[in-house]
């Protein structure tokens, strides 16, 4: 089996003005597509690995031969991160979480606004390229960030919300103003999908 680039669940211009059409197009058809292509290339001749699910593959990198481990980590991580990221956004997104996710956030951070501040700090504070995440870890939620294309599954944590802070994710529109991109992100967060990811992880 070969890994494939998933279709976006909306048009390239659907997240305007938060994320511009050109960024979405390049990010999906070029950046994400390259991770998929390179992942498939790395797995050539490794039939046992090709038959694993993507999450299984990156959850257990020790099972990947050392000579392709870095390629699988970077490109498998990139494929997993972006496949989730697209689903976590919606043209009908924004607002606040409800239900169990809202309860968890309020219990842990005191308020949704305080959670937003801490998540934004993790995203802004990630030096260079990487991601900010809300994850489920042993039944509890926590905020973390990862370098490059590392995914929380590599540390045994389940991501339920993620934000790409690579410059390619925002530079065409926001240039060096990463904090502006981070604050705009809340306008497109798909809290229904976050809730679905949470219920799978909890």
UniProtKB/Swiss-Prot annotation:
EC numbers: 1.15.1.1
GO molecular function: metal ion binding; superoxide dismutase activity
The keyword Cell inner membrane is assigned to this record: no
Cofactor(s) listed: Mn(2+)
Keywords of the record: Cytoplasm, Manganese, Metal-binding, Oxidoreductase, Phosphoprotein
Leader peptide range in chain numbering: none
Cofactor binding summary note: Binds 1 Mn(2+) ion per subunit.
Modified residues (Phosphothreonine): 34, 70
Catalytic activity, reaction form: 2 superoxide + 2 H(+) = H2O2 + O2
A Pfam family the protein falls into: Sod_Fe_N
GO cellular component terms, A-Z: cytoplasm
Residues involved in Mn(2+) binding: 27, 82, 164, 168
Top EC category: oxidoreductase
Intrachain S-S bonds: none
InterPro entries: Mn/Fe_SOD (IPR001189), Mn/Fe_SOD_BS (IPR019833), Mn/Fe_SOD_C (IPR019832), Mn/Fe_SOD_N (IPR019831), Mn/Fe_SOD_N_sf (IPR036324), SOD_C_sf (IPR036314)
Matches recorded under PANTHER family: 37S RIBOSOMAL PROTEIN S26, MITOCHONDRIAL, SMALL RIBOSOMAL SUBUNIT PROTEIN MS42
Quaternary organization: Homodimer; under aerobic conditions. Under anaerobic conditions it is a component of the so-called 'green protein' complex (GPC), which consists of at least two components, SodA and a nucleoside diphosphate kinase (NDK).
Function noted in UniProt: Destroys superoxide anion radicals which are normally produced within the cells and which are toxic to biological systems. Active only in homodimeric state.
Family the UniProt entry places it in: Belongs to the iron/manganese superoxide dismutase family.
Name of the molecule in the record: Superoxide dismutase [Mn]
Organism encoding this protein: Virgibacillus halodenitrificans
